[in-house]
């Protein structure tokens, strides 16, 4: 483990791996994805690590993604969090709206992506992903596409 790892937070490599695997399995390239529902538990270490993972997985496209954490609205639902966030991601595609990350006033400088602060955003969403990250780097990412 790296110095920034612990039993509760891996260093971000496993999160990047989960996102890359989801894109590969779905036949998506990073620039095909417009929206990411991040795990985003609002912890300094976890959010910085997830930001680093998003940058590693999406490269230059990371700065063009709409990234949010809907946990800012519904809280951490433990085992149900991944399912609820996957449903929210599908609804974002259906309605073509990225939900906001509410109460984002003073973001950590290490968290420098477009987190859709405080207000929903109408946008084109053809493909989206949802992260569900667990203790010690037990991570899952689902990828979804708009039906054509």
Name every feature range the model reports, one short phrase each:
Residues 1-148:
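Conserved "HGTGT" condensation-loop signature of ketosynthase/thiolase-family condensing enzymes
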